[in-house]
Amino acid sequence: MTMELTPRERCERAVRFEDVDFVPLTIYERKIPQCEAERELRNDGLCIVQRGPGVFGVRRPNVLGSESHSFVDNGRRVTRTVTRTTAGELSTLVQPAGFTTWHHEKMFKGPDDYAALLAYASDVEVVPNYEPFMRMDELKGGDAVMRGAVGLEPMQLIVHHWMGVEVFAIEWMERRDEVLKLYEALVEERRKTYPVLAASPCEQFNYGGNVTPEIIGEARFREYYVPNYEECCEVLQPAGKLVGCHFDANTRVIADAIAETSLDYIEAFTPAPDTDMTLAEARAAWPDKALWINYPSSVWLRSDEAMEEVAVDLLKQAAPGNGLLIGVTEDVPDGRLYPGLNAINRAIHEHGRLPIA
C-alpha cells in the first residue's frame, strides 16, 4: 500500500477501520518532552494525542463560591479547597506528588455531605467553549490527533473522585438510595453535555474509564455504566463523532458487556502480561471496535530488543491490523522513553505495514 499520510491522518483513519500504510504509534501530549529526539520520532510517524482543551464549560448555580489555599503540613505541601453550596460546604485536601496528586481528603466524608453534593451536582448548565479547541487544533496540524473528553461516567465519578472505594462500598450497602440520587443528578448533567459535544469541532471523545471490574462487577457495570455509553453514542455518532473508553485494567469480567456497547474504540487497553486478556483475545471479543492499546507498561523495563520482540508479537496478534493503534498512555521509567519508542517504531515499520501477515 502506497500512501502519504500525516501522523494525524493515520490515526484518524485507523480508528475508523480505514486503510492506512502502517499501524499508528501514539503518545499523550504530557508524556513526551519537546526535543530533538521527539521531533525525529514525529518525523518518523509518531503521533501526539492532544487531550484538550475541552469544548465545554460548566456553570453550577448552586455553588456560591470556592476558595483554595496551600500550606505545609508535617513537611508536606498540601492544598485545601472549600466549596460553598446552597446546602453546605464541601472540602478536599490534595498533595501534589510529581506527575500525580495524592488525595488525602475527598469531597464526601460522611452522610452529612449528601445534601451539599446533591446541590453541587444539580441544575448544572453546560455551555459550549469551542474557540480554545479550534486554536489548538490549528496549531497542531498534522502532528497531533485531537481528542475530547465527555467526563467520567456518573458512577465512576462517585466511586473514585467523590468517595473513594472503601467509603463507596460502605455507602452502597448502608445508604444506596442517597448514592443513587447523586448518580441520577450526574446522569442529567451528562445528558446536557452530549448535544454540546455533538455540535463541536472535535471528532472523537473518551467517555470516562479506569473502571476496576473487581470492584464494580459485571452486573453494576451493565446497570450503571453501559446505559450512559449508549445515551452518549446515540447523540454523538449521528453527528459523525467517535466515542471510546479508557479501559486499562483487567477487562475479562466485563468483556461481553463491552462488546454489546456502541463504543467505537477501546482506548488504553493494556494486553497481557499486564492484564488478564491478550491482544488476540481482545480482537476476538471486540471485532467491531478499534483497539487503541497501551503498550504494556511492565515491558518498558526490559531491553530494547525484548521491547521490539513484544511489539512484533502484538502486531501479529492483531493481524491483519485494521483498527489497531499502539499508544503510550502511562508513565515510562526514567531513561527508557526514547529507546523504547524507537524499538516499538522499528517493529511497526518492519512488521506493522498493512495488511499484517
Indicate residue ranges for each PLM-predicted region:
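Active-site loop segments of alpha/beta catalytic cores
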Residues: 1-32, 116-357
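Segments that shape or occlude catalytic/ligand-binding pockets
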Residues: 30-67, 71-72
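Short, surface-exposed loop and linker segments with low hydrophobicity and enrichment for Pro/Ser/Thr
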Residues: 10-21, 64-80
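Surface-exposed flexible segments
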Residues: 37-47, 91-102, 339-340
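Polar low-complexity intrinsically disordered regions enriched in Ser/Thr and small residues
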Residues: 48, 57-60, 68, 113, ...
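A contiguous, low-structure linker/loop signature
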Residues: 69-123, 142-145
